[in-house]
Amino acid sequence: MKKALAKIQKTEINTYIDEFVKARQKYFTDGQEWLEAKVTDEKIYVQIDRKQLEEELDDMIKISLQFGQVLPLEMKIQVHKVAGGAEISYMDNGAGSWRCGRIYAPEKAGRAASPEKRWGVQIA
């Protein structure tokens, strides 16, 4: 079996997250679940593997839907500019805080220091 290679590409992260959220909102039931994007007007360009980031965010949403245990379940994805890139935060209002997560998206592509960084995203 061949290992898939990461496809790192320059991406304006606020636009990407906004489009990601809009594409998924149609799958939620009104009054039961809601996904919201909190992005800025500032253009923040990062080097990411879009497919990997999409999978990580979808996994966080799936876990919230399975274990949130609250109605209405409100999920938020927020983008912050940080030194050297952007931080993508995910949170929900469900029971417990273990489903919350942060992903670092670097401004410049570089050599990975660890296997986790090879995908172009880091889960904190």
Labelled PLM ranges:
Residues D92:
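Acidic ATP/Mg2+-coordinating residue in the GHKL
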Residues D58-I63:
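Conserved polar catalytic motif of the HATPase_c/GHKL fold
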Residues K2-A6, Y45-I48:
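Conserved micro-motifs of the catalytic ATP-binding
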Residues W34-I44:
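Conserved catalytic submotifs in the C-terminal HATPase_c
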